[in-house]
Regions:
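Mature, function-bearing regions of proteins
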Residues: 1-219
Length: 219
């Protein structure tokens, strides 16, 4: 992906700074998920996650130049990006436009008419939850207000998810690939066992599987 933006600036997805920013959002997304929905991380877990995010990035074979060396360095980098670099673009708006949100793959039995009635409320809640995960500076950039009532709602949802997650058996909390990795490491599966693909429940609906927006094994 590359080109020239509306201000005449050239861009390319493989630019090291651009490529690392995408990776940084994966790291922060994992961090926010743990903090908001899983009761948080210990200091040791924070350090481990940061170190693993660097190790993961190194696997891409890209320059390590943009990668902060410490968590403190990363926080400064993140704050700078959110406050001074990010822009409100059509791509950002597309992510937040859930007006055509498809029926979840795990509810194939739900009639389309029923989903059409449920979709507006689901979309509003999903966007509200997403905005709650944003830094305040990003909310401001995109024009979202955030009241005490919004924060209270957000915290209640996070707490409900955290409590529900505790009821899920430990093995079922992991993605099938992560679970298989643990099983290979502990000897439950042979070290050369084939990697599992995305489970059927996670696949897009059949009429959307040819879209380049989705990864579908064997397509």
């Amino acid at each position: 992906i590359g080109g020239v933006d509306a201000q005449g600036r050239r861009y390319h997805a493989l630019d090291p700074d651009t490529f690392y920013w995408a990776h940084a959002t994966f790291y922060v997304g994992t961090l926010r998920t743990a903090e908001c929905f899983m009761g948080g991380l210990t200091e040791a877990q924070h350090e481990q996650l940061f170190a693993e995010h660097r190790q993961w990035y190194a696997l891409y074979g890209m320059s390590m130049r943009p990668v902060p060396a410490t968590r403190a360095d990363f926080q400064r980098y993140w704050d700078h990006m959110c406050r001074e670099v990010l822009e409100d673009t059509p791509a950002a708006r597309v992510v937040l436009d859930l007006s055509e949100l498809p029926r979840p793959p795990f509810l194939p039995w739900l009639p389309a008419r029923v989903w059409a009635l449920l979709r507006p409320a689901v979309a509003r809640s999903a966007v509200r939850l997403t905005v709650g995960l944003y830094d305040p500076s990003v909310r401001e950039l995109l024009g979202y207000s955030w009241s005490e009532a919004d924060e209270h709602w957000f915290r209640r949802v996070c707490r409900a998810v955290e409590l529900a997650f505790r009821l899920v058996p430990a093995r079922r909390r992991m993605h099938p690939r992560a679970r298989a990795g643990v099983d290979r490491a502990t000897g439950r599966l042979p070290a050369d066992a084939p990697l599992p693909q995305t489970p059927d429940r996670n696949l897009p609906l059949p009429d959307r599987r040819d879209s380049p927006r989705h990864y579908v094994p064997g397509r």
